[in-house]
């Protein structure tokens, strides 16, 4: 997302500006190694641009600086910034999911905005200790699915900018492994090391 008063109104305009002046536009994230940071690196790689990346200690101070005009852009969890987007304080240039987010239907997906095949989605799941009996896992999953399908709970998540998705434990495990592979590739590419 970017500050609402930026002259670039679309992702392609923002990318063109970044290509015309490599390293001059700023882009914040919520901290080194966060989902936002890794998504940001994937975006820069996919778009073929160089931004002056600034790692903050969380999304809140970054969005404050964005709204204050001290930053050109930032990547963060869309649900965390939904209030600012919906209030028109910042402009969403794209969402990183394959589908538009119901809370802000006018914000295009990365693919719609001109980044074919780009998708990077953070998600939450329920985990249990290793060795938990499969029947307990299945009961926990059934309860979670039932809760997420409850209309009021489902709508509350959508209104907050979340996209509730249900699935099986096997699907969650497959998704986890696929995400670890994709994120591992970007971690290796940028040379990120634990400290």
Spans of features found by a protein language model:
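Conserved beta-strand segments of alpha/beta enzyme cores
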Residues: 26, 50-52, 91, 163, ...
């Amino acid at each position: 997302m970017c500050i609402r008063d930026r002259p670039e109104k679309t992702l392609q305009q923002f990318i063109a500006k970044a290509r015309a002046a490599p390293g001059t536009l700023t882009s914040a994230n919520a901290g080194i190694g966060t989902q936002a940071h890794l998504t940001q690196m994937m975006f820069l790689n996919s778009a073929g641009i160089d931004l002056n990346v600034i790692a903050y200690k969380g999304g809140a101070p970054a969005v404050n600086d964005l709204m204050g005009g001290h930053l050109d852009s930032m990547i963060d969890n869309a649900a965390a910034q939904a209030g600012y987007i919906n209030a028109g304080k910042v402009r969403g240039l794209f969402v990183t999911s394959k589908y538009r987010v119901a809370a802000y239907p006018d914000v295009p997906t990365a693919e719609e905005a001109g980044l074919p095949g780009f998708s990077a989605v953070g998600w939450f799941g329920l985990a249990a200790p290793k060795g938990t009996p499969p029947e307990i896992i299945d009961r926990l999953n059934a309860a979670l699915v039932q809760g997420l399908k409850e209309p009021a709970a489902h709508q509350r998540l959508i209104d907050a900018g979340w996209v509730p998705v249900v699935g099986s434990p096997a699907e969650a495990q497959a998704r986890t492994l696929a995400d670890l592979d994709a994120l591992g590739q970007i971690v290796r590419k940028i040379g990120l090391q634990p400290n």
